[in-house]
Amino acid sequence: MMDQEEKTEEGSGPCAEAGSPDQEGFFNLLSHVQGDRMEGQRCSLQAGPGQTTKSQSDPTPEMDSLMDMLASTQGRRMDDQRVTVSSLPGFQPVGSKDGAQKRAGTLSPQPLLTPQDPTALGFRRNSSPQPPTQAP
Protein backbone atom coordinates (compact mmCIF):
# COMPACT_ATOMS: atom_id res chain seq x y z
CA MET A 1 0.00 0.00 0.00
CA MET A 2 2.80 2.40 0.88
CA ASP A 3 4.67 1.62 -2.36
CA GLN A 4 1.71 2.71 -4.53
CA GLU A 5 1.36 6.00 -2.63
CA GLU A 6 5.07 6.75 -3.07
CA LYS A 7 4.83 6.14 -6.82
CA THR A 8 1.89 8.53 -7.23
CA GLU A 9 3.65 11.19 -5.16
CA GLU A 10 6.69 11.00 -7.42
CA GLY A 11 4.41 11.51 -10.44
CA SER A 12 5.56 8.42 -12.25
CA GLY A 13 2.68 7.93 -14.67
CA PRO A 14 2.84 7.02 -18.34
CA CYS A 15 2.94 10.71 -19.40
CA ALA A 16 5.41 11.80 -16.73
CA GLU A 17 8.26 9.57 -17.92
CA ALA A 18 10.86 11.55 -19.79
CA GLY A 19 11.57 10.07 -23.19
CA SER A 20 8.76 7.55 -23.26
CA PRO A 21 8.21 5.91 -26.67
CA ASP A 22 4.85 7.69 -27.07
CA GLN A 23 6.40 11.08 -26.41
CA GLU A 24 9.33 10.39 -28.70
CA GLY A 25 6.98 9.33 -31.47
CA PHE A 26 4.82 12.42 -31.00
CA PHE A 27 7.79 14.80 -31.08
CA ASN A 28 9.29 13.05 -34.11
CA LEU A 29 5.97 13.38 -35.95
CA LEU A 30 5.64 17.03 -34.90
CA SER A 31 9.19 17.81 -36.00
CA HIS A 32 8.65 16.09 -39.36
CA VAL A 33 5.36 17.91 -40.05
CA GLN A 34 6.71 21.32 -39.00
CA GLY A 35 9.87 20.74 -41.06
CA ASP A 36 7.76 20.00 -44.14
CA ARG A 37 5.75 23.19 -43.57
CA MET A 38 8.94 25.23 -43.35
CA GLU A 39 10.30 23.66 -46.52
CA GLY A 40 7.01 24.37 -48.31
CA GLN A 41 7.24 28.06 -47.40
CA ARG A 42 10.81 28.51 -48.62
CA CYS A 43 11.52 30.14 -51.94
CA SER A 44 14.67 30.33 -53.99
CA LEU A 45 15.99 33.82 -54.68
CA GLN A 46 18.71 32.77 -57.09
CA ALA A 47 18.30 33.77 -60.73
CA GLY A 48 18.31 31.01 -63.32
CA PRO A 49 21.12 30.65 -65.89
CA GLY A 50 19.37 32.69 -68.61
CA GLN A 51 17.92 35.30 -66.27
CA THR A 52 19.61 38.49 -65.20
CA THR A 53 18.58 40.60 -62.27
CA LYS A 54 18.10 44.34 -62.61
CA SER A 55 20.84 46.40 -61.01
CA GLN A 56 19.82 47.88 -57.69
CA SER A 57 21.88 51.00 -58.42
CA ASP A 58 19.36 52.14 -61.06
CA PRO A 59 16.14 52.94 -59.18
CA THR A 60 13.15 53.65 -61.38
CA PRO A 61 11.80 57.21 -61.57
CA GLU A 62 8.57 55.98 -60.01
CA MET A 63 10.48 54.65 -57.01
CA ASP A 64 12.37 57.94 -56.70
CA SER A 65 9.16 59.96 -56.69
CA LEU A 66 7.58 57.55 -54.20
CA MET A 67 10.55 57.87 -51.85
CA ASP A 68 10.53 61.68 -52.18
CA MET A 69 6.82 61.79 -51.42
CA LEU A 70 7.28 59.46 -48.46
CA ALA A 71 10.15 61.51 -47.03
CA SER A 72 8.19 64.73 -47.47
CA THR A 73 5.08 63.30 -45.82
CA GLN A 74 7.03 61.86 -42.91
CA GLY A 75 8.89 65.16 -42.50
CA ARG A 76 5.59 67.05 -42.28
CA ARG A 77 4.29 64.54 -39.74
CA MET A 78 7.40 65.06 -37.63
CA ASP A 79 7.00 68.84 -37.92
CA ASP A 80 3.37 68.56 -36.77
CA GLN A 81 4.49 66.70 -33.67
CA ARG A 82 7.15 69.23 -32.67
CA VAL A 83 6.53 71.46 -29.69
CA THR A 84 7.66 75.07 -29.54
CA VAL A 85 9.02 76.00 -26.14
CA SER A 86 8.56 79.67 -25.33
CA SER A 87 10.86 79.72 -22.32
CA LEU A 88 12.98 77.41 -20.26
CA PRO A 89 14.33 78.19 -16.78
CA GLY A 90 17.86 79.55 -17.10
CA PHE A 91 17.63 80.20 -20.84
CA GLN A 92 16.59 83.17 -22.91
CA PRO A 93 15.56 82.95 -26.54
CA VAL A 94 17.92 84.47 -29.12
CA GLY A 95 17.27 84.93 -32.81
CA SER A 96 14.56 86.63 -34.82
CA LYS A 97 12.03 88.90 -33.16
CA ASP A 98 9.70 86.01 -32.31
CA GLY A 99 12.53 84.16 -30.56
CA ALA A 100 12.75 81.38 -33.10
CA GLN A 101 14.63 80.68 -36.28
CA LYS A 102 13.30 78.64 -39.19
CA ARG A 103 15.33 75.51 -39.89
CA ALA A 104 16.22 74.85 -43.49
CA GLY A 105 13.71 72.58 -45.20
CA THR A 106 11.12 72.56 -42.43
CA LEU A 107 8.08 74.60 -41.61
CA SER A 108 8.51 74.58 -37.83
CA PRO A 109 10.60 77.11 -35.92
CA GLN A 110 13.56 75.93 -33.87
CA PRO A 111 14.34 78.11 -30.85
CA LEU A 112 17.93 79.18 -30.34
CA LEU A 113 18.66 79.26 -26.63
CA THR A 114 21.66 80.58 -24.73
CA PRO A 115 22.27 80.31 -21.00
CA GLN A 116 21.50 83.41 -18.93
CA ASP A 117 23.44 82.44 -15.84
CA PRO A 118 25.84 79.48 -15.70
CA THR A 119 24.85 78.78 -12.09
CA ALA A 120 21.23 78.41 -13.21
CA LEU A 121 22.24 75.39 -15.25
CA GLY A 122 23.09 73.34 -12.16
CA PHE A 123 20.41 70.72 -11.86
CA ARG A 124 19.18 70.11 -8.38
CA ARG A 125 17.67 66.86 -7.26
CA ASN A 126 14.52 68.49 -5.94
CA SER A 127 14.08 72.03 -7.21
CA SER A 128 10.51 72.47 -5.98
CA PRO A 129 10.10 74.55 -2.83
CA GLN A 130 9.47 72.52 0.30
CA PRO A 131 6.87 73.64 2.83
CA PRO A 132 8.34 74.58 6.19
CA THR A 133 8.23 71.77 8.69
CA GLN A 134 7.53 72.20 12.37
CA ALA A 135 9.20 70.27 15.13
CA PRO A 136 6.85 67.94 17.06
Swiss-Prot record:
Query: A GO biological process this protein is involved in?
Result: G protein-coupled opsin signaling pathway
Which GO molecular function annotation, any one, does this entry have? guanyl-nucleotide exchange factor activity
**Record keywords, A-Z:** Phosphoprotein, Repeat
Residue spans with biased composition (Polar residues)?
A: 49-59, 107-117
The segment annotated Disordered runs over 1-64, 86-136
InterPro entries on file: GoLoco_motif, Pcp2, TPR-like_helical_dom_sf
Phosphoserine carried by residues? 127
Q: GoLoco domain location, by residue? A: 23-45, 63-85
Query: What does this protein's UniProt record list under function?
Result: May function as a cell-type specific modulator for G protein-mediated cell signaling.
Protein name in the entry: Purkinje cell protein 2 homolog
